[in-house]
């Protein structure tokens, strides 16, 4: 399946199409959207965003705890869309 992923970035909103087997960070990059990242392995917080609406599968990540996930935090480098989803990017500093 292909879903619409909307990124709310400091520069404004941008929407991409993302297959359900593509990480949302990769889909953003392919569309020329510059998002923060570091490890690309789901084991740090550089790429952290927050899900505003919709859902993702981020079972590949190993950094966020259950409370952070419940609050909506997402590691974009290790998240597949499972519906149309809106994500606020650049939210690493909000996780502390």
From Swiss-Prot:
<dbReference type="InterPro" id="IPR036010">
    <property type="entry name" value="2Fe-2S_ferredoxin-like_sf"/>
</dbReference>
<dbReference type="InterPro" id="IPR010241">
    <property type="entry name" value="Fd_pln"/>
</dbReference>
<keyword id="KW-0479">Metal-binding</keyword>
<dbReference type="GO" id="GO:0051537">
    <property type="term" value="F:2 iron, 2 sulfur cluster binding"/>
</dbReference>
<feature type="binding site">
    <location>
        <position position="47"/>
    </location>
    <ligand>
        <name>[2Fe-2S] cluster</name>
    </ligand>
</feature>
<keyword id="KW-0001">2Fe-2S</keyword>
<feature type="domain" description="2Fe-2S ferredoxin-type">
    <location>
        <begin position="3"/>
        <end position="93"/>
    </location>
</feature>
<dbReference type="InterPro" id="IPR001041">
    <property type="entry name" value="2Fe-2S_ferredoxin-type"/>
</dbReference>
<dbReference type="GO" id="GO:0009570">
    <property type="term" value="C:chloroplast stroma"/>
</dbReference>
<dbReference type="InterPro" id="IPR006058">
    <property type="entry name" value="2Fe2S_fd_BS"/>
</dbReference>
<protein>
    <recommendedName>
        <fullName>Ferredoxin, leaf L-A</fullName>
    </recommendedName>
</protein>
<keyword id="KW-0411">Iron-sulfur</keyword>
<feature type="binding site">
    <location>
        <position position="39"/>
    </location>
    <ligand>
        <name>[2Fe-2S] cluster</name>
    </ligand>
</feature>
<comment type="similarity">
    <text>Belongs to the 2Fe2S plant-type ferredoxin family.</text>
</comment>
<keyword id="KW-0813">Transport</keyword>
<dbReference type="GO" id="GO:0022900">
    <property type="term" value="P:electron transport chain"/>
</dbReference>
<dbReference type="GO" id="GO:0046872">
    <property type="term" value="F:metal ion binding"/>
</dbReference>
<keyword id="KW-0150">Chloroplast</keyword>
<keyword id="KW-0934">Plastid</keyword>
<comment type="function">
    <text>Ferredoxins are iron-sulfur proteins that transfer electrons in a wide variety of metabolic reactions.</text>
</comment>
<feature type="binding site">
    <location>
        <position position="77"/>
    </location>
    <ligand>
        <name>[2Fe-2S] cluster</name>
    </ligand>
</feature>
<keyword id="KW-0249">Electron transport</keyword>
<feature type="binding site">
    <location>
        <position position="44"/>
    </location>
    <ligand>
        <name>[2Fe-2S] cluster</name>
    </ligand>
</feature>
<keyword id="KW-0408">Iron</keyword>
<dbReference type="GO" id="GO:0009055">
    <property type="term" value="F:electron transfer activity"/>
</dbReference>
<dbReference type="InterPro" id="IPR012675">
    <property type="entry name" value="Beta-grasp_dom_sf"/>
</dbReference>
<dbReference type="Pfam" id="PF00111">
    <property type="entry name" value="Fer2"/>
</dbReference>
